[in-house]
Amino acid sequence: MLDIDLRHFPSKLHKARSVALLGNGGNLAVAQHMASDITRHTGKFCYAPDSVHTTALGGDGDWKIAWMQYAEFADLVIGITCRNCSGISNALMEVQDKCDTLLICPQQHKSLDTLIIPAKTYHEFECTALWTIYRLMEHIGVELPDLPHLQ
């Protein structure tokens, strides 16, 4: 696995009561998976758009802008993207004065708090983003369950 510098990022998750996550493509799947697991393992209210919401909210336009109207009610909004100049980072910039934000991305963003995952491929990034969010949970004291055959 890649060496990821978590710095102050666990404290963002720790202090948030509600978390909104978003991403594109495989990163949207990571966001949906993590919204479920953060809720299940921490008791925090977490949500991410599903494919029905992304197409219904967006219509012929950009779904991320419409969805952020919901996300801005969260204490923390996490965006997961493989490009630091994307619709995901633009959406985070729109709400960063209303709530705490965290961009998970391979490169540092010029104005967003960025957790850098130095991946070389899309798939490596998606898998490492998922693993990194589990590490954030462990850093705030969450005990993640073992596989059943290991118990």
Regions found by a protein language model. Name each.
Residues M1-A16:
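A short, well-structured juxtamembrane/interface segment
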Residues N24, L28-L150:
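Glycine-rich phosphate-binding loops that contact phosphosugars or nucleotide phosphates
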